[in-house]
């Protein structure tokens, strides 16, 4: 049985505003 809360993949989105790094968004794909 697989743990449904386990994140198997993560996708990172680097966010830039006016050419400056504004942070990173991490999405967990199950």
Swiss-Prot record:
Query: Gene3D superfamilies per the record?
Result: Cyclophilin-like
Under the heading InterPro entries, the entry gives: Cyclophilin-like_dom_sf (IPR029000)
Listed A to Z, the keywords are: Chaperone, Endoplasmic reticulum, Isomerase, Microsome, Rotamase
List cellular component terms (GO): endoplasmic reticulum; intracellular membrane-bounded organelle
Q: Where in the cell is it found?
A: Microsome; Endoplasmic reticulum
User: What chemistry does it catalyse, as a reaction equation?
Assistant: [protein]-peptidylproline (omega=180) = [protein]-peptidylproline (omega=0)
Query: What GO MF annotations does this protein's record show?
Result: cyclosporin A binding; peptidyl-prolyl cis-trans isomerase activity
Superkingdom, natural source = Eukaryota
| E.C. no | 5.2.1.8
Q: How is its activity regulated?
A: Inhibited by cyclosporin A (CsA).
Domain (PPIase cyclophilin-type): give its ranges.
12-30
Endpoints of the signal sequence: none
User: How does the annotation summarize its subunit structure?
Assistant: Monomer.
- What is the role of this chain? PPIases accelerate the folding of proteins. It catalyzes the cis-trans isomerization of proline imidic peptide bonds in oligopeptides.
Q: Which family does it belong to?
A: Belongs to the cyclophilin-type PPIase family.
Q: What is the protein's given name?
A: Peptidyl-prolyl cis-trans isomerase, microsomal
């Amino acid at each position: 049985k697989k743990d449904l809360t386990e994140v198997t993949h993560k996708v990172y989105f680097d966010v830039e505003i006016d050419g400056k790094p504004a942070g990173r968004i991490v999405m967990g794909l199950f």
